[in-house]
Design a protein with these regions (language model features):
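GST-like domain detector, emphasizing the conserved glutathione-binding G-site
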Residues: 2-135
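Positions that flank functional sites
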Residues: 39-41, 166, 219
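Phosphate-coordinating loops and pocket residues in cytosolic domains that bind phosphorylated ligands
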Residues: 52, 206, 215
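Residue-level recognition of oxygen-bearing side chains
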Residues: 77, 196, 209
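GST-like fold's C-terminal all-alpha helical module
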Residues: 107-202, 206
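C-terminal helix/juxtamembrane-tail motif
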Residues: 210-224
Length: 224
């Protein structure tokens, strides 16, 4: 690809997963080009230009042109690859091999398995499914609140998830948290129900790199 930047990031304008990869790239000052495939979220098979790089046909996928066009997909794996390879000063990550490093992995896995699927299923049933079964909506809403409860319990005792500083672990939760609390959950007051988690989330969202990326997303969505 001829854009001259180190990375190509396959993403989706409204969806959260590509954007939290962009958060990490931006935090580390790494150059990247967003590519938005014509992805139908209701289709079982992704477009050919995406399947070429990700056999699962979903975003995100990342090409590292500085590493022989190495391709990696799944947002948690991508973020771990980026910080392990490029965050040599440990600005937003912990040193491999340390106990804190594995705690960081723990939270990345929890985000990928505990936050993303439940939050994503609520979006699916609330926005795309032809029927709106209340029992299903309640199921995923309750799971989302359970995840927030896990975060609330931990963050009530410490400022950040691991390492006494904001890391890739904290940042990985941000895009889904913002989307679900501002556009999907009904009759939900984040600050009232989970005040510590809401405060933590706002601190992450206010970081210059995060704000820059999220503002870019807003502009793209406004353009249609």
């Amino acid at each position: 690809m001829s854009h001259g930047k180190q990375f190509t990031l396959f993403s989706l304008k409204p969806g959260p997963n590509g954007w939290h990869v962009a958060f990490i790239l931006e935090e580390l000052g790494l150059t990247y080009e967003n590519v938005f495939p014509n992805l139908d979220v209701t289709a079982h098979q992704g477009p050919e230009d995406l399947v070429k790089y990700n056999p699962n046909g979903r975003i995100p996928a990342l090409i590292d042109h500085g590493n022989n066009d190495f391709v990696i997909w799944e947002s948690g794996a991508i973020n771990q690859y980026i910080v392990d390879r490029y965050d040599k000063e440990r600005k937003i990550s912990l040193a491999p091999g340390t106990e804190e490093y594995y705690t960081q992995l723990q939270w990345l896995y929890f985000q990928a398995s505990g936050q993303g699927p439940y939050f994503g299923q609520l979006v699916w049933f609330a926005a795309y499914h032809p029927e709106k079964p209340q029992s299903v909506l309640d199921r995923y809403t309750n799971e989302i609140k359970r995840v927030f409860g896990v975060l609330e319990g931990v963050l009530s005792k410490q400022e950040w998830l691991v390492g006494n500083k904001p890391t890739v672990a904290d940042i990985s939760f941000c895009s889904w948290n913002e989307i679900i609390t501002t556009t999907v959950l009904q009759n939900f007051n984040f600050e009232k129900e989970f005040p510590v988690t809401a405060k933590w989330h706002k601190k992450i969202l206010a970081r210059p790199a995060i704000k820059k990326v999220w503002d870019e997303r807003a502009k793209l969505l406004a353009q249609g």
